[in-house]
Amino acid sequence: MNCAVGGRSGALLDTPRLSPASTNPRRFGSHIERLKSVGESHQPMTSLGTASAAPGEVDTGRLPIGETRDGARAGLPVCVINGDEAGKTLYIQAASDGDELNGVGVVRELVPQLDPTELSGTILVVGIVNVYGFRVAEHRNPIDDTKMNRAYPGDEHGTSSERIAAATFEAVQRADLALDLHQGSTSRMIHETRVRCGPRHHLHDECLSLAKTFDCGHVLDQKGPDGQLARAAPDEGIPTIDPELGGAVGLDPESIDTGVEGVMNVLTAYGFLDGEVTNGEQTRATGFEQYGAPAGGLVDFELDLGDSVEQGDRIFRVTDAFGRVKAETTADVDGVFWRTRRLPQVATGEYVCSVGTDVDTV
């Protein structure tokens, strides 16, 4: 398949290689020493697209996905971090929704922090999945007007989004666990991790454990729509979660820090890095109650994100431009104040906020 994970023969462009072995002898040893360590290590050379790293190395490249409208070859930015010692493989991807940049921010902060000589196993990273949406700051892939996280496991002969999904899913299938970094688009949302395989899935407990290890403080444990990576990958035996890193226009430093800490928790707990992880108790919701505007105007919220909600609590009110109250909305259920729209102006029936329901602790 043309867009499959491959070696360097399919190079798309002259992507700069990270060459720590040749540029930093103190850290990685001489070329001869590195070749010797490769021969002695049980860890193999690892490639993803045009990126290829020996044990103790990092490399970046491109994962082919076809051609653009002017016939230029197109690819996703990828990185391979290949540890000195054998171990598990972690797959990480970001920006399958093109306007969700916090995951890209996590990758940008995380990769320079990781020393492959101190790592057991391999990390495969796709830094930007929806490259077409990313380039124009759109949520969906503008080539086929598709939400990328509804296209998995993909089709190598299908639409643009299906081909991208197929190329990345082939990499996912090489992993022992996977993180699909998201956020609540440009709305306001708490930090949470999503378990999307469904409570009856044979990997549910493994996915929930991974979500608890990431430790955002909140978990949404609810079967997701068809086509989500966190639904498709568990069907192949790979525990996978969607960390949802708040919601922002652009990059949010607090959410990025939360994401980096979450990935480091996973790397430590699953044996990629030395150390111990102690996770706190987390709030889990298994459903949502959404609220729309009963009238047009401007919304004022009565609660902060993460607040506990009791049935009958006033959640928001709608006023006109002169401050006159037109409508008030109270909670129908108990739960957690989970997500809100970012802009205050609303039309009748327009989405305003969500309350996480059926709440317990895990």
Show the residue positions of the predicted features.
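Structured catalytic-domain cores with a bias toward divalent-metal coordination
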Residues: 2, 10, 14-15, 20, ...
